[in-house]
Design a protein with these regions (language model features):
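Walker A/P-loop
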Residues: 18
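Conserved phosphate-donor/acceptor-positioning beta-strand/loop module used by diverse small-molecule
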Residues: 97-102, 111-136, 167-168
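Post-Walker A helix-loop "phosphate-sensing" segment adjacent to the P-loop in P-loop NTPases
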Residues: 25-34
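Small-molecule kinase domains that catalyze NTP-dependent phosphoryl transfer to phosphate-bearing small molecules
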Residues: 138-206
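ATP-binding Walker
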Residues: 15
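Extreme N-terminal, non-catalytic leader segments
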Residues: 1-6, 29
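ATP-dependent small-molecule kinase phosphotransfer cores
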Residues: 38-97, 104-107
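P-loop (Walker A) phosphate-binding loop of NTP-binding proteins
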Residues: 10-12
Length: 206
């Protein structure tokens, strides 16, 4: 059995990444969402074990000491991280796994797993990003300004380090682009070696 593929999706906060990721998981079979660990509090209808594993700072820092993360980062005073064992369990079963992580975490994963496929979600403009952050009503004005400043000074330029860039100005088009990337990556020759060899045997080859 061929190992599954690791996909990374990153974006400035408010670019629509989480909504696209949820839609992609529903559209594409054998694609598993990687549930990250975080020290932040749940928002809205979020549940532990579904959107995130919500843990306290002491638990998270102990996991760091024990090298249990394939990546982790501190963003706006909260930790976020991907557990190594969760990722390995999925890809060993031949399934693909999708990591919804920030640009710092993505850089760590690329160093440890050079064959990952990375996707950057770009907002259509600064003004649209600001409006989306305000409309979702999850942050106070000060936090929104911090997020916009971070996007403008740091995050938006990280697109250069990604394999694919999707501009999320139309949700349906962005969704179809993400789906197409995953399906195309599954058709790469190296990913299909086992199936190809099985077919060749039916033609009398070895």
């Amino acid at each position: 059995m061929e190992r599954g593929k690791v996909f990374i999706v990153s974006a400035p906060s408010g670019a629509g990444k989480s909504t696209l990721v949820k839609g992609l998981i529903q559209l594409v079979s054998n694609l598993v969402f990687s549930v990250s660990y975080t020290t932040r509090q749940p928002r809205g209808q979020e549940l532990t074990g579904r959107e995130y594993h919500f843990v306290d700072r002491m638990v998270f820092e102990k996991m760091i000491e024990e090298d249990k993360f394939v990546e982790y980062a501190k963003v706006f005073d909260h930790y976020y991280g991907t557990a190594r064992v969760s990722l390995e369990d999925v890809v060993e079963k031949g399934k693909d796994i999708l990591l919804d992580i920030d640009t710092a975490g993505a850089a760590q994963v690329r160093k440890k797993l050079p064959d990952v496929v990375s996707i950057f979600i770009m907002p259509p403009s600064y003004e649209v990003l600001r409006k989306r952050l305000e409309l979702r009503k999850q942050d106070n004005p000060e936090t929104i300004q911090k997020r916009l400043q971070w996007a403008a000074e740091k995050e938006i330029y990280q697109y250069e380090n990604y394999d694919y860039v999707i501009i999320n100005d139309d949700f349906s088009q962005a969704m179809e682009s993400m789906r197409s990337i995953v399906l195309a990556e599954r058709c790469r020759k190296g990913r299909m070696t086992h199936r190809i060899q099985s077919i060749i045997k039916t033609f009398g080859g070895t």
